[in-house]
Amino acid sequence: MGRRALLLLLLSFLAPWTTIALRPALRALGSLHLPTNPTSLPAVAKNYSVLYFQQKVDHFGFNTVKTFNQRYLVADKYWKKNGGSILFYTGNEGDIIWFCNNTGFMWDVAEELKAMLVFAEHRYYGESLPFGDNTFKDSRHLNFLTSEQALADFAELIKHLKRTIPGAENQPVIAIGGSYGGMLAAWFRMKYPHMVVGALAASAPIWQFEDLVPCGVFMKIVTTDFRKSGPHCSESIRRSWDAINRLSNTGSGLQWLTGALHLCSPLTSQDIQHLKDWISETWVNLAMVDYPYASNFLQPLPAWPIKVVCQYLKNPNVSDSLLLQNIFQALNVYYNYSGQVKCLNISETATSSLGTLGWSYQACTEVVMPFCTNGVDDMFEPHSWNLKELSDDCFQQWGVRPRPSWITTMYGGKNISSHTNIVFSNGELDPWSGGGVTKDITDTLVAVTISEGAHHLDLRTKNALDPTSVLLARSLEVRHMKNWIRDFYDSAGKQH
């Protein structure tokens, strides 16, 4: 695994379609959610209203009157003023319309919960840019990009909705989010318990900070996914790195690698680390999107894509050339399952510049997640967690240095037992589950485990191929939400 790129590519799952210039250790600090394609169509057409709310740029200072328009979406087809509820999606690091169209669970349960659906865009993403074209100009303009400010936006928006929508004032609100959005949903319930009666935090790695979990747990889970999906699959990948290193020592070897991997551009010796990072990122992405049915994010993928990949990686005890030819076949499943791609492009691609820049700044300030590999418990080249290296890159890119302890100071780390009404769901296939809450903390801080689930599978729309484990998870989640709604109305009745 790359010396400084490992940490960053682990988080680089925001749609790669625009190239931007970022320092090496910042490039892959993309995001926690799945790769997104702005041109991809949702599985089911969604009907919603697009609205805007004027937010303060700084909720915590009193010497500025600067405001910006936060975008949010509302769908009220099934909402009932009597006995209804509001499901509030705490927006992630990206365009809110994509999250709206790809969080089918909320749409599926809206009628049952008599719910209005609200999807709130996170500041500094999508159209919710506090300083317009100057939003990413420098660290002074980015200074208000924090989870705390985003949570305050959500609180102000909920107050606005309850003030302005007849019938909404006395209804319970439930926060829902996935990945970073799931972290925000949990933190919102912790920090603003009077605003939401509960939270569903799907695939939310709230403990992937400091030393709360081992730094190698993420890549260990990725490796387990491949090991369980085919005999000798992970071992083939583990041996591929040395094969690449040996073949790249000569000009003829580089030429052979370029052809064998069907790359769009000739490899040079300076490209090898990037090549290995790109391959590693592919295996990580596959672990996140290992869904039980065909899906389409960056490109079409088959059902259970890791099993398909592992069909080509059954024998690690072959020559370097044959092993890497097999690696190409495996990569081709991810990058060219449709058969439309003529060559594989390892040149740097990331999300739209604004989205990637926003998240790389967050990863340089408060969202500091340690990652490492050792090549023994995982199938990657050894890489140690190096905070100083990250800090130096962040300072050169943004003029800021990370505060690795701030998230645990703000939100409590593992000391959260005083909070209530949060469901933490995690898929066992999802590498982010290593930093998630996977065991009940109290009777009201509940963990739901999905044995056949990848990254927030439970938030996706229902599918005929959904495994029993995700059906049970969704059923449990709805049951908890119904209990929160019932308790809210019971309490309101007693007060009158």
From Swiss-Prot:
Its EC number is 3.4.16.2. Glycans are attached at N47, N101, N317, N336, N345, N415. Belongs to the peptidase S28 family. Homodimer. One of its GO terms (cellular component) is lysosome. Residues 22-45 form a propeptide. The gene is PRCP. SUPFAM superfamilies: alpha/beta-Hydrolases. This is Lysosomal Pro-X carboxypeptidase. Residues 1-21 form the signal peptide. It comes from the Eukaryota. GO terms for biological process: angiogenesis involved in wound healing; negative regulation of systemic arterial blood pressure; proteolysis; regulation of blood vessel endothelial cell migration.
